[in-house]
Amino acid sequence: MVTAGTGAESLKERFEQEGDTYNSMLLQTLTDRLAEATAEYLHEKVRKEYWGYAPDESLSISDLYKVKYQGIRPAIGYPSLPDQLLNYTLDKLLNMSQIGVRLTENGAMYPTATVSGIYIAHPDSQYFMIGNIDEEQMKDYACRRNLSEAEVKKLLNKNISN
């Protein structure tokens, strides 16, 4: 987990209070990109050094964009892991507050320029997305997560077939 938003949120709020939409949006864009770039850098360090499963990897920027490396880094709240409440489990493991990150009631990370990911190093791993699920699958997920059906419908509304 990385954040580039610590301290930036108060500056962004100041810009907004002053009616400076341009600098507010610019700051948000810069901090978002910085967080994403740092997450990608750490993923590369994991592949090449920390876990060392691809020590000789030498990819161009183009190849990095095309995900030509081994392994994936899916993130909670994105198409492969749409249940943002999983961030609460991640928080129990990582204690996000140590780096100034907290969760909203819906499980979104604040500051918003914060990125998490789950490293999967298997050579055949690929990014994926959860498609539509039917009523039975939704009920099964609610049971497995110990959530009400209403909570799951809210969390996964884009994934539930009508």
Question: Which sequence ranges carry the predicted segments?
Answer:
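Small-residue-enriched alpha-helical segments and adjacent helix-cap loops
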Residues: 1-126, 155-157
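Charged substrate- and nucleic-acid-binding regions of tRNA-handling and nucleotidyl-transfer enzymes
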Residues: 121-162
